[in-house]
Design a protein with these regions (language model features):
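N-proximal low-complexity "stem/linker" segments adjacent to membrane-targeting elements
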Residues: 1-25
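Glycine-rich, basic loop-to-helix element that forms the pyrophosphate-binding segment
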Residues: 43-59
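Short aromatic/hydrophobic "clamp" motif used to bind/position activated sugar donors
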Residues: 64
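Conserved donor NDP-sugar-binding/catalytic core segment of glycosyltransferases
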Residues: 76-108
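Short, flexible, basic/aromatic active-site loop/helix in glycosyltransferases
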Residues: 111-131
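Acidic donor-binding loop at a coil-to-helix junction in glycosyltransferase catalytic cores
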Residues: 157-165
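Active-site donor/metal-binding and catalytic loop motifs
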Residues: 172, 177-196, 201-209
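Non-catalytic, C-terminal membrane-associated alpha-helical segments of glycosyltransferases
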Residues: 200-203, 217-271
C-alpha cells in the first residue's frame, strides 16, 4: 500500500530515534499510513542537498514531508493538518520555533538570534514573502514537484540550499502555502560551532553569489557598498576588529548587530 506520507529525515551524526517514534505514534493516532526514511550522511558524505535528493528518490509516497533531525514534536503538531493543507498547494511550510529556555548554555548567541527570528515566524508573516521565508526544517512537498526541482547539489556544505529551492519555486510559479504547524528546533550548537557554520555559510554565499543574487539581504547590502566604494574600508576595519568582534559573539552578552557586522566583514574578505 502506498503511504499517505513519506517522511524524510536527513541526518548527520545525530540520534533522531525519539523523533521517529513520535512521528510514527502521531501517524497512528491520526490514522495515516507513513513511510519514515532517515538518511544518515555521517559515512556517505553526500552533502546536504544530495542527501535530501536521494531520500526523495527512495520515497514511495505521493507527498514528502522533510523534517530536520534535531526537531522535537510539540503536542499541537499534526500530520493530518499537513495532509489537509496539501489540498491547497503543492508546497506547504509548517514553521518552527524554539523553546523558552535555552537548551544549550553554550549557545547564547544562537539562542538569542533564533528567539528574535521566532517573533516573525508565524504563518501570517511568512506568507508576506512566501518564497524568501521557505524553510525545509519542516516542509511538505508533492513528490513530483520535488523531483522536478530538487535541491541544488552545488550546496555541499552548510547554508542556502533552502534559499535556492525557494528561488526555483518562485521562478517556476509554484505556489507555497505557509501554515502554523511548527516543530521545535532543539539542536542548538555551542556558539563556537555556530560561528564556524556561519563562516561556512558565507563561503557558500560567496561561491554561489550569482545564483543567489536577488535572494540575499547580505548580497544586497554588499552591492550598495560596492556602489559607494566602501568595501575596502570595511575590510580594513573588520580585519582590525575581528578579535574583539569574536570575543563579543562568543561571550555572555553577544550583540546581534555585531553578528551582522561580523558576517558582512567576513564575506567581504573572501577571495
Amino acid at each position: 500500500m502506498t503511504p499517505t506520507l513519506s517522511i524524510l529525515i536527513p541526518c548527520f551524526d545525530y540520534d533522531c530515534s525519539k523523533l521517529v517514534a513520535d512521528l510514527q505514534r502521531k501517524g497512528d493516532e491520526e490514522g495515516l499510513s507513513l513511510e519514515i526514511i532517515v538518511g544518515d550522511d555521517t559515512l556517505t558524505r553526500l552533502g546536504r542537498a544530495r542527501n535530501r535528493n536521494r531520500l526523495a528518490e527512495q520515497a514511495s509516497g505521493e507527498w514528502l514531508l522533510i523534517v530536520d533531525c534535531d526537531a522535537a514534536m510539540p503536542p499541537a503538531f499534526s500530520l493530518r493538518k499537513y495532509v489537509e493543507a496539501g489540498r491547497q498547494a503543492p508546497v506547504v511550510c509548517g514553521g518552527l520555533y524554539h523553546p523558552d529556555v535555552n537548551p544549550c548554555p553554550e549557545a547564547t548567541l544562537r539562542f538569542k538570534y533564533e528567539r528574535k527570528a521566532d517573533l516573525r515566524r508565524a504563518a501570517r508573516f511568512r506568507q508576506e514573502h512566501p518564497y524568501a521565508q521557505l524553510s525545509t526544517f519542516s516542509l511538505l512537498v508533492r513528490r513530483e514537484t520535488f523531483l522536478a526541482i530538487r535541491f541544488d547539489e552545488a550546496c555541499v556544505e552548510y547554508g542556502y540550499e533552502d534559499t535556492l529551492f525557494g528561488a526555483e519555486l518562485e521562478r517556476r510559479g509554484i505556489p507555497i502555502l505557509h501554515i502554523d504547524n511548527p516543530l521545535i528546533h532543539m539542536g542548538l550548537e555551542p556558539d563556537a560551532i555556530f560561528l564556524a557554520k556561519t563562516e561556512t555559510a558565507m563561503r557558500t554565499l560567496h561561491r554561489l553569489e550569482q545564483k543567489l543574487r536577488g535572494h540575499s539581504h547580505l548580497l544586497a547590502t554588499v552591492d550598495r557598498l560596492r556602489r559607494l566604494h566602501l568595501c575596502g574600508l570595511i575590510r580594513c576595519c573588520w580585519r582590525l576588529c575581528r578579535k574583539p568582534l569574536r570575543a563579543n559573539l562568543l561571550g555572555k552578552h553577544p550583540s546581534l548587530f555585531l553578528f551582522s557586522v561580523y558576517k558582512l566583514g567576513f564575506f567581504l574578505c573572501l577571495r
